[in-house]
Amino acid sequence: MLICAIPLSTKPSRLHKIRTREPGGRNVLLNLTKRCRWFEFITPSTLALQPLLELLLQPAANEHRELLQLGLQEALVNAVRHGNGNDPAKLVRIRRIHSPQWLIWQVQDQGPGLQPEQRLALLPDELDAISGRGLFLMHQCFDDVRWSPRGNRVQLAKRR
């Protein structure tokens, strides 16, 4: 159950820098602040994610939709299970930012956060394991993945 979706009239106070993979490495953050649309979604910790995923993916082009859905679902499941410990009283906050050049999602939980060594996106030794591939998949689905210093917010960016 979605608690609220808020269109933000001004940009949030903190947005991590986005790395480009282009030669020359121009500053994409400058472009992001010019013509962006910002939305914030707040939801209780639940694994019933399909309605939320549909809202989050509205600005995504069809050719990227399945890949982005996989990566976002992994981020949301990690926030609910690992960050919030499946506690329905805890909330997950998602920001969706889109510009002509980028689609960006920030997923934040109320947990203690991942330590830097836990954020490595290594493929697990056991490929058929039930879990353990989420961070690896997020890095495969998005052009840029960054963490807040505390480790309880991940930013996922995909170039349009």
Protein language model regions, located:
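Short C-terminal beta-strand
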Residues: N152-R160
